[in-house]
Every structure is written in C-alpha cells, then in structure tokens.
Amino acid sequence: MGIFIVLEGIDGAGKSTQAKMLAKWFENRGYEVVLTKEPTDTAFGKLIRRLVLIGGKEGIIDGARISKEAEALLFAADRAEHVKKLIEPSIKAGKVVISDRYFYSSLAYQWARGLDLNWLINLNAFAPRADLVILLDLPVKESINRINGRSIRSEFDKIVELQKKVRKNYLKLAEKFNEIRIINALAPVEDIHNDITALIEHELFEKAED
C-alpha cells in the first residue's frame, strides 16, 4: 500500500510550495509520487473555480445563485471523483499521494460559512482519511499580507473575518483528527520543508519500524 499525505492551512500558508518540495523529496528517495489538489481539474472542480461567494451565505456560478449546502455538495462531488479515480487507485498501486487540500478544507471552510460540522463530516464519510495531514498554521495578519495582491479591496473585511474563522476551525479539527500535525508556517520556506520531512520520518517511518 502507498502513503497518503495532505497539506492544509488557510490561504497564503504555502501549501502548494511545500507540496511540490515534498513531492521532490520523496522522488529523490525512489518513490513514485502523485501530486494532486482540490478542487481538482475535473468538470466539478472547474465548476467550483467559477464559484463566486457573496456575503458568506450563498454563491454565484455563471449568474446562478446556489446555497452553501449546494456548494458543499459540489465540493463533495468533486472529491468523490478525486477519490475513486485517482487517490484510491494510486494508494493501492503503492504510490505516495500528496494532496494540496482535501476534505479537511471543506470542514474548516464550510463550517466557517455556517454549516453544521457533523453534517459535513457525514457528507464526506466516503473519503478515506489521510495517513498524515500537515496543517501549515499561519496568523491571519500574515495570511492577508500574502494574499492581498490576489484580492479585491472591497472584499477585504470579509476575507479577514473568514480567514479568522477558518484558522480557528483548523485548530479545532487538529484536536478531533489524530492524523493532523501542526507546523509553524511563519518560518522560512526551507525550514518549513525540513520540519515537514522530519515529521514524516518520525510519524510514518520510525513508528512503522517499532
């Protein structure tokens, strides 16, 4: 069987950068790596990328309003395709799967948007839990500094409030899911990478030998 690792964190935490560095680290050690992300590049994922959120209550896709419940179902549909067509087959083939976001993101973000956590957990019950989830924890102020160039100024206050809720939710999820480990995302990029690989060595390799 393979290894399934997920990188999570609020916007601007450096997930994509660290996922690529981690994939290279495994490849240098002879592993076959599948680097993936959510939302995916499937039809569902492309639809999600056209989603524009308004006021934390509903969203718009191509001019059509959808509820936050429909939004959660759309993310779950994308994830179902991801799991069945890529994640599970790759793990069964003995590969290392590294995902930039997974269902933990849905829990943190959609919980922050007012949906019930248990409802979200049940909705995503089909998705296998990761062997290790690396939560790149970043203060909201630094997150805003990093993503400010990507954002519309008129949405600034909404973004700050959402990121505060999401960070709080991620830290709560770390208490609920024992596969989640917290890494300080304020450190330099190379230091974060070294912290992640040391964690993997300990959690996935050394413990397996005991």
UniProtKB/Swiss-Prot annotation:
Molecular function in Gene Ontology: ATP binding; dTMP kinase activity
Residues the entry annotates as binding ATP: G9, I10, D11, G12, A13, G14, K15, S16
E.C. number(s) listed in UniProt: 2.7.4.9
InterPro entries given in the database record: P-loop_NTPase, Thymidylate_kin-like_dom, Thymidylate_kin_CS, Thymidylate_kinase
Keyword Cell membrane: no
Keyword Oxidoreductase recorded: no
Keywords: ATP-binding, Kinase, Nucleotide biosynthesis, Nucleotide-binding, Transferase
Catalysed conversion reaction: dTMP + ATP = dTDP + ADP
Gene Ontology cellular component list: cytoplasm
GO-annotated biological processes: dTDP biosynthetic process; dTTP biosynthetic process; dUDP biosynthetic process
UniProt cross-references to CDD domains, sorted A to Z: TMPK
Gene3D superfamilies to which the protein is assigned, alphabetical: P-loop containing nucleotide triphosphate hydrolases
Domain of life: Archaea
Family: Belongs to the thymidylate kinase family.
Official protein name in the record: Probable thymidylate kinase
Species in which this protein is naturally found: Thermococcus sibiricus (strain DSM 12597 / MM 739)
Taxonomic lineage of the native organism: Archaea, Methanobacteriati, Methanobacteriota, Thermococci, Thermococcales
